Structures are given as structure tokens and as C-alpha cells.
Amino acid sequence: MYDHFNSPSIDILYDYGPFLKKCEMTGGIGSYSAGTPTPRVAIVGAGISGLVAATELLRAGVKDVVLYESRDRIGGRVWSQVFDQTRPRYIAEMGAMRFPPSATGLFHYLKKFGISTSTTFPDPGVVDTELHYRGKRYHWPAGKKPPELFRRVYEGWQSLLSEGYLLEGGSLVAPLDITAMLKSGRLEEAAIAWQGWLNVFRDCSFYNAIVCIFTGRHPPGGDRWARPEDFELFGSLGIGSGGFLPVFQAGFTEILRMVINGYQSDQRLIPDGISSLAARLADQSFDGKALRDRVCFSRVGRISREAEKIIIQTEAGEQRVFDRVIVTSSNRAMQMIHCLTDSESFLSRDVARAVRETHLTGSSKLFILTRTKFWIKNKLPTTIQSDGLVRGVYCLDYQPDEPEGHGVVLLSYTWEDDAQKMLAMPDKKTRCQVLVDDLAAIHPTFASYLLPVDGDYERYVLHHDWLTDPHSAGAFKLNYPGEDVYSQRLFFQPMTANSPNKDTGLYLAGCSCSFAGGWIEGAVQTALNSACAVLRSTGGQLSKGNPLDCINASYRY
């Protein structure tokens, strides 16, 4: 379940898994020599990034670490919400819910705490799936090719991934071949191949790129796609984890890197909920004090400088002074609440622009706890992908050893424009009933089972809109065309610790400051970058193979 394989990420040509494995055996990411004073460190945000950074700093010998959290819980956008405290096994993953093993930094911590990832996430085509398209239902058996109507776009996309793209006067290496290069350690070849894709498509949206690729002279798979029909079909089918029509305006290279990094393959579900990782991190004890007891549940306002010190001011009026600060809050909070982009006190103009302009998606979810696992008993699809209002429907079995247990149905998972539609229905009962009616128009039998336990909509229907979440103002980073350079600036910001003349003592972290927005791996990677930056800039010694010494900006975005 946890077997490690080499899985460097394409944009950084580095794998955090081996470094973490070595550090686990040697004691930490670094250390301080006897007599070297250790810094006082504030971490803004007690999500996975903040908790990982705190863990590694405390293991390395930093004594004074304070985490600030504006919510009333730890975890941030990692949020396994329980329907009912009397039924704690039934959860709604409001944030991250799919976990690919190629996320080796994340899987290191899952293994460390013995958190099971044995269950496959019910992605389309992995389980029995139904595609609802233009008022008709199409059955897609588990492990088989999709229905004939979708065959051309499916095979075309698969051919692009496995064969690459033939240009006039040249070709681009198959994305899956780039993945193989990464896994086999042929990093220079992988970098050259990825730069080729960047050179051609860095300024193209996902939609513009696939139109160029599949209507040109050399379409992968051999068949040109028809406009607009095949592109509408592809938007509903997606690339492995559901329909991508709502993100057609995202950057093509942003989507392609997910495939190359393996994030769309073998996605796992965590039966105990991903919040169990946040809880296990917080339960660790250092010097007789639990990590969770270092969390101050208070919202940080402005972050400012006074000589060589950094001032944290909470909205309750408290001020505290620190030597180093790691900020893991959302990019919107960095700009509007912490005021980090107001001057060059902490961030260069280039980095400040990246903070301000990086695109965050809107996303909404609605879950129902049903009386039974009706899809199993009645041989109904486990997953539905629809061109209607519901978009993605996923049936989740959190107690497979109990046939008579309840079911959890993610009735609606939407992105961007589709998520914005949900904002017009803030009342969850109304929203739920509208979604059920939408589904009933095509599959009335399935829809008839979508009633919460005991008819209790208040308790057994859970929903969340990330766009209006005051702590996030968006779900996750998803670059628009031309914005990959923003991810580069944000990811490498902690590397200023290598240059004393550029180092301000404040470091950015979180998945929106990575090349893996929306994936916990990005949160883990940037947490480690920032923790290493604290050690390096305050007289600590980093372990060999650390990211500050091994990762370089390798691409022209």
C-alpha cells in the first residue's frame, strides 16, 4: 500500500519521498549545533502545510513554534466533516478527497501514521459508471472503454498521452513517456521534453490546445474531432477524474502536468478521512507538549516588520514578535488580510504579483447520508457524470464490511461556472432537492434513493461553497494560460533563504504556492521548503539532499 517508487515532479525534477524517508531515519530535515540559539517561529495556518512545517521544525530542534488558525478547527481545506457525532465513520470530504500514490511526500506521512489508503476512489471508468449526455444514459462498465459515442475523443486523448503530438517540422514527446523518464531518473531528458510542451502551449487554454491538437493535420488517434460535438463530448467525459468542461479556460500545461505527475492515476480514498492526517500530526508531542497545544485559534491580520523582527498582529488586537514567519494561508488572505503585497518588506514585486493574480477556482460540494448503500443492492452506477446541473455524482462506501450500513453520496461536485450556479441556492435543502430533481429527469430510479436518513436535511445533508469561504475565497489554484510563471515565483520564494541579501525571514507555503494546486502534495512540498528555509537562515544545518540545495528553476515559462 505504501511501497515507494521514484516519482519526481516534472516542474521541480525532485522527489520529496526519498528525502523524507532518509530524514525519518536520521532524525529530521536538519539540526542546530550545541549553543546555537534557535528562532522563534510563527506559522500562519494550521492546515496540512502548517502542521507539516511545524512538525519538521520541532523535530529539528526549534523550541518556540506558534501556529495561528483563523478557523475553529485544524486542517484548513483538509476537512472530513462528520454528519453525526453518533455515526463518526460517515464523513463528507469537503476539500481534498483523491490521493494518488505519486504524491510521495503526502504518502510518507500517511505511512508514518499508519493511515490506510487501501480503497480505490470511484473515478469514472474505474467503477461502473453512467454518462448522462443530452438527455440519454450511457453505461460504462468498470475497467472497460467508454461507450461508443465517446470512443473517438477517449481514444484520441489516450493516443496523445501515449504517442505524443506531431508538429509541423517536429514532435512533442508523449506525456506518459515523460512520466517514465521521471520514474527512471532520466531527469534531463524529461526536462527537455517538458520544455518542448511549454514552448508550444504555455499561452494556450486547455480548450484552445485540444482544438489545435485534434483538428490539425496530425490528430492523435488518427481521427479529427468534429467541432463542436466532439469537444462537448470530451468536456463531459474528462481525462480520468470527471468532466473538465468547466475548466476548459484553464491553462493546458496546468492540466497536462497533472497527468505527467501521475496525479490522475490510481487515485485512492482514505476510509478514515483525510482529516485523520491533520489530527495525527497535531497529536504529536515535542518536549512534553502536544503540537495541537501550540495552535492559537485567532485570525492573523497585518504582518509587518520592525527592524530584524516580524510582528504578527491578530484581529483580537494581540501583537507578538517573531524571528521567522511561514505563511500558509490562501493567496487572497496573503493580499487582503496580511497585506503582504503592499510593499517590498517581505515579497519582491514579482512574487507579490503572483500572489495577487494567481487564479483560484470556485468549487462546491453537496453530500447526502442515505439510509442504505442502494447502488450496491440495486446494481446502480457507482459514479455518474452528467452534462446537467449535478455534474459529478459519487457513491462512497465508508463501511464495506457492513452491508446494511449507510451510504454517502456526493450528489454534486462542481467547479468554476457550475459552482457559481450553486451560490444562487444557499439553502442546502432547496439545493439538494433541485439537484435530485435534475438527476430524476434522466435517472428517476437512482434519484428516488437520494433522501437523507430520517428525512433530516439539516443533519444528513452537508454542503460547502469554497468561493464564499471567508478563510479561502476559493478552492484551489488552477493556472490560467501564461500563469505558470506565477507558480514558479511562489514555489521558489523560500529559496531566498539561500541568499542573505534577498532573505526577508518570511516564507510562503501551501498548495496554491506550488505547481500542484488542489493536491495535498503541493502543501507538503512547500511546507518542507519553508521549514528548510527557516533552518538555513537561522544557523541550522540541513540534511543532505534537501530541496533548498537540490531544486533549481529549470524552465522558461
From Swiss-Prot:
FMN binds at residues 49, 69, 71, 77, 98. GO terms for molecular function: L-amino-acid oxidase activity; tryptophan 2-monooxygenase activity. It is an enzyme of class 1 (oxidoreductase). InterPro entries: Amino_oxidase, FAD/NAD-bd_sf, Flavin_monoamine_oxidase. Keywords: Auxin biosynthesis, Flavoprotein, FMN, Monooxygenase, Oxidoreductase, Plasmid. It holds the Pfam family Amino_oxidase. Its cofactor is FMN. Changing residue 466 to F: Slightly decreases enzyme activity. Pathway: Plant hormone metabolism; auxin biosynthesis. Monomer. This is Tryptophan 2-monooxygenase.
